[in-house]
């Protein structure tokens, strides 16, 4: 299993294949240990008082890219008591490089502006975005100042956020992406849920469970 996980990471692919969308889930179908698991140690959320949903992802992951339209539409309709955030998975190599790209753009407050464009650049246009200079050149085409980006990319703040992301992935016990975690308690993925839409149904179910428990 360890070799399988390592192979998937080195290949830049997810362990959780999208496959064919399984039959739509009803709330009665969703069971702990089947569609989702409870983490043995609950992880503190970033915004206490809100129900937190985290997606762990990698820009280079094809399954994350295919999941994007569904999760973007879903996240855009979340109620006020739910917070959604993305966290890059950092497994070394390009994972870390792209994770640093994401965290830099997030620190600059411009990540939503270019999130989809970065996915498209990698998966449609074949760009690697493997160096800060290549990233800066690409981002300049989207109105982001090169020098400001390069300064932020190497900043202490971004490096600190990298360490936090690494620790979070360990706490969540993830081995591939995309993965979702609700309220620091429940982890699930495309494979366990049975496809993209079912994954979001599991998220909705767990959000409602957490809301009812408040």
Swiss-Prot record:
One of its GO terms (molecular function) is disulfide oxidoreductase activity. Gene3D superfamilies: Glutaredoxin. Transmembrane segments: none annotated. Residues 18-208 form the Thioredoxin domain. Residues 1-17 form the signal peptide. It is found in: Periplasm. The keyword ATP-binding does not apply. Keywords: Disulfide bond, Periplasm, Redox-active center, Signal. It comes from the Bacteria. The keyword Lipid metabolism does not apply. One of its GO terms (cellular component) is periplasmic space. Involved in disulfide-bond formation. Acts by transferring its disulfide bond to other proteins. Belongs to the thioredoxin family. DsbA subfamily. This is Thiol:disulfide interchange protein DsbA. It comes from Azotobacter vinelandii.
């Amino acid at each position: 299993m360890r070799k399988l996980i390592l192979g998937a990471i080195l290949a830049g692919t997810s362990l959780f294949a999208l496959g064919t969308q399984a039959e739509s889930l009803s709330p009665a179908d969703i069971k702990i240990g089947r569609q989702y698991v409870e983490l043995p140690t609950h992880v503190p959320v970033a915004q206490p008082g809100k129900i937190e949903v985290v997606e762990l992802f990698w820009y280079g992951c094809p399954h994350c890219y295919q999941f994007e339209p569904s999760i973007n539409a879903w996240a855009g309709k979340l109620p006020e008591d739910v917070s959604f955030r993305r966290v890059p998975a950092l497994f070394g190599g390009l994972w870390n490089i792209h994770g640093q790209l994401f965290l830099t753009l997030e620190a600059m407050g411009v990540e939503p502006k270019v999130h989809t464009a970065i996915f498209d650049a990698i998966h449609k246009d074949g760009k690697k975005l493997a160096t800060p200079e290549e990233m800066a050149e690409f981002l300049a085409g989207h109105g982001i100042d090169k020098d400001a980006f390069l300064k932020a990319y190497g900043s202490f703040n971004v490096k600190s956020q990298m360490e936090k992301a690494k620790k979070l992935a360990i706490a969540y016990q993830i081995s591939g992406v995309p993965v979702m975690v609700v309220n620091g308690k429940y982890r699930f993925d495309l494979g366990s849920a049975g496809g993209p839409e079912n994954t979001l149904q599991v998220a909705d179910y767990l959000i409602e469970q957490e809301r009812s428990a408040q």
